[in-house]
Amino acid sequence: MVTIHLQPRDITMLSLLGDVGILDTERLHARCFAEVSLRRCQQRRKLHTEQGLIRSQKLAVWYGDQSGRVPTLFTLTERGADVVAETTGLRPFRVHRSEPKPETFHHRLAIVKTRLALDDGFRSLDLNPPQWIMEQDRRPDAKPDEPPSQQRLLYHPFSSGNVTITCQPDAARRMSIPRDAARAETGMIDLIAFFEIDRSTERRGQVLSKFPGYAALIEQRGWLRYFSSATAAPVRVFFVCLSQQRINTLRECLSEHPLASVLRFATMLDLTSRHPLTDAIWQDTSGRRREIVRVTAPLAH
């Protein structure tokens, strides 16, 4: 086996994998090896895999919305996590210990794409990106004999009479955002954000079935379990969809729902905006486009 001398960008890559959980070739190259060719990046990745630092998997099934090669996905191994811990003093949180189904990989990669786009939006405003809670993150007190879904930090059960309803967002974050990005003197506010990655596979009834859980989560402020000091923060539920047509369908389905005012919709393409926080890419149920962070004057970018 060839010995590899780890460079700072290698540690950056391993740390990023341990933070977001999964990356594809495109994002791994762009974020960790942008100064070298794709071929050189692939050669380096091969060494990482041979050394047992990362795990690669080419999906047998790909539901991509664009033609092209089936992506290879990368996750951090326990050995890779050990290397990061020894080098930085911080052990990565998200290490894959099993092989999820292809559809789970698809879903988690879409969550990561959303996260990275919004993190870039925070950096564009000279703000540190908030921490995320991802769908696979486990409760500290989770028991091994519990069903996997119930071990998740974002699993919220609520009693409604003799029935238990649940809410399981795909991701969550507590955002501390400017009241006005152009006027620092206006200060900051908190926003609790939940995310739903919509793959256009759920029918109307399946979509609507999510909302008793969201209603209970918002009414009972279930996020205080992990965002304990955000007692008065407003809530938004952000749907990230594959197409505008799908957004139109969801808007029609949800426009009269009691939670309509907290819903926002954008496409994956919308998230390629350079400024996904201050650009009006998020549609409400009426179709009006809104921003997450208000800006009353042009920003110097």
What is each of the regions a protein language model found here?
Residues R173, F194, V237-F239:
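Structural beta-sheet core signal
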Residues H5, T201-S209, E219-H301:
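Non-catalytic C-terminal interaction segments of nucleic acid-processing enzymes
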Residues M1-P102, H301:
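Nuclease-adjacent, charged terminal/linker segments that flank catalytic cores
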Residues R174-S176, E196-T201, A216-E219:
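Extended serine/threonine-enriched, polar tracts that run as long, contiguous segments within proteins
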Residues D82-W132, D190:
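Amphipathic alpha-helical dimerization/coiled-coil segments
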Residues G64, A117, R123-L191, R203-G213:
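Active-site metal-binding core of divalent-cation-utilizing nuclease and nuclease-like domains
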